[in-house]
Amino acid sequence: MKALHFGAGNIGRGFIGKLLADAGIQLTFADVNQVVLDALNARHSYQVHVVGETEQVDTVSGVDAVSSIGDDVVDLIAQVDLVTTAVGPVVLERIAPAIAKGLVKRKEQGNESPLNIIACENMVRGTTQLKGHVMNALPEDAKAWVEEHVGFVDSAVDRIVPPSASATNDPLEVTVETFSEWIVDKTQFKGALPNIPGMELTDNLMAFVERKLFTLNTGHAITAYLGKLAGHQTIRDAILDEKIRAVVKGAMEESGAVLIKRYGFDADKHAAYIQKILGRFENPYLKDDVERVGRQPLRKLSAGDRLIKPLLGTLEYSLPHKNLIQGIAGAMHFRSEDDPQAQELAALIADKGPQAALAQISGLDANSEVVSEAVTAYKAMQ
């Protein structure tokens, strides 16, 4: 099996590319960074530091690389069985024309073996968005052929890849946490389903997208907000504070109760998933700053995001939410010299008061009981 992966950055090399190469797939990276391309083509291998309770070094081998803006990448798309991406949501649109050219070439060469394309980005249904960009770049006479022979497969990805703490200047060396999750929508594949260790197939992708948002993202944000208020520097320091840990774990259990009601997740398995995430926050190798994780509080307090969306779920199913309320109050206190949203939040609260400010940011009813609970918690933290 042959694969082309767009994006030879830390996530590309340390997560998706590693899983593909470890599965024995013939892998080519596509990127614009000439230093990385030259190093990959000179060595055909690189080292990945996998850090958890212990550290191990894995070698990924048998890889090569091409420029993502040349003709080679177009030729490869005409030949490979799988295309994956880890380029960041904004860059998907930029790689679409090259993919479209490659698909036209594939059609012209009469290659009708199925091709599947999977965007592995931190966004909801990223491949569907990539498909839209590719379709816009295709000539009309190629669109029906692409619909028939090319699968655009959505996925959910989760692995923390911190800034490398390596003492070397090796452009290929990368550090990743032990945990990784790559869940793909099996209903969208063309041809046989691939068997790639570390890739999980599901017919209910949105359940897993929400599970990550309501657990990892909710817990991470609340740890950051309460940690900053308590004077902690890192996520690890904050989660080792018993008072903060109790609220974070409680909030993840509250959001988890929503997931169990909504999607039928197994309660014991979800409790184990929460424990695993608490362990990830404690990882001594991931020096995650509370200020970095807390950034953009207006976005994180919006209706569809990690704090308000699970709260709305607790209201929908009449479930408890006192710890989620503590997290929301903590977010309202977030102040950072370097974050424009933190400054805007402070100005809004100063101008309108906490009740009207929270209602405006979150879309919650200003006169609702939950807004009143959040304001009470906010004032108690002052």
UniProtKB/Swiss-Prot annotation:
It catalyses: D-mannitol 1-phosphate + NAD(+) = beta-D-fructose 6-phosphate + NADH + H(+). Keywords: Acetylation, NAD, Oxidoreductase. NAD(+) binds at A3, L4, H5, F6, G7, A8, G9, N10, I11, G12, R13, G14. GO terms for molecular function: mannitol-1-phosphate 5-dehydrogenase activity. The modification N6-acetyllysine is found at K269. The keyword Phosphoprotein does not apply. GO terms for cellular component: cytosol. SUPFAM superfamilies: 6-phosphogluconate dehydrogenase C-terminal domain-like, NAD(P)-binding Rossmann-fold domains. The keyword Transmembrane helix does not apply. Its EC number is 1.1.1.17. PROSITE patterns: MANNITOL_DHGENASE. One of its GO terms (biological process) is mannitol catabolic process. Belongs to the mannitol dehydrogenase family. NCBIfam families: PRK02318.1-2, PRK02318.1-3, PRK02318.1-4, PRK02318.2-2, PRK02318.2-5. This is Mannitol-1-phosphate 5-dehydrogenase. It comes from Escherichia coli (strain ATCC 8739 / DSM 1576 / NBRC 3972 / NCIMB 8545 / WDCM 00012 / Crooks).
